[in-house]
Regions:
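Conserved class I S-adenosyl-L-methionine
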Residues: 6-14
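Short glycine-rich anion-binding loops that position phosphate/pyrophosphate groups of nucleotides
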Residues: 14, 73-76
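Conserved SAM-binding loop of SAM-dependent methyltransferases across substrates and taxa
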Residues: 15-27
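Conserved SAM-binding motif I beta-strand of class I
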Residues: 28-33
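S-adenosyl-L-methionine
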Residues: 36, 40-62
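Short SAM/SAH-binding signature in class I
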Residues: 65-72
Length: 141
């Protein structure tokens, strides 16, 4: 995540651990979940944060946050979420993406859509490793 970041949406926030960590670092955080049971647990876990129920980026307004984190889902799902909300996605300065699979296909899609891969790293969790991408520079039309 860019060091200068001030606001972020954690899309598909799950149990809220990442959102809580980001808020503790001083960022303004919007945490989202698409399923009502998961959203209810998120609201209980993070009563002090802005938690929203809805699909992907659809619960955000263009320019409301500087960037988004999409982690713990497949590359195809990440691409679908970004593509489904072009006004919101086009207003983002950056994305941090951690696809569970199909990272290379996601990178190809992002580049074709006008995004630039600024950093690529590997995160290790137990026996598994995952690609982590910092994506910026969407060509706004």
């Amino acid at each position: 995540m860019p060091g200068h970041a001030r606001s972020v949406a954690d899309v598909g926030a799950g149990d809220g651990q990442l959102a809580r960590h980001l808020a503790a670092r001083g960022l303004r955080v919007v945490a989202t979940e698409r399923r009502p049971p998961s959203f209810a647990r998120l609201r209980v876990a993070l009563p002090q944060l802005d938690c929203r129920l809805g699909e992907g980026l659809e619960v955000l307004r263009p320019g409301e946050v500087e960037g988004v984190v999409l982690a713990g889902m497949g590359g195809h799902s990440i691409a679908r979420i970004v593509a489904a909300s072009p006004a919101v996605a086009g207003a983002l300065d950056w994305l941090v993406l951690q696809p569970q699979q199909h990272a290379d296909r996601l990178v190809a899609w992002l580049e074709a859509a006008g995004w630039r891969i600024d950093a690529r790293d590997i995160a290790v969790q137990g026996r598994r490793s995952y690609t982590v991408l910092l994506v910026t520079g969407h060509e706004r039309s």
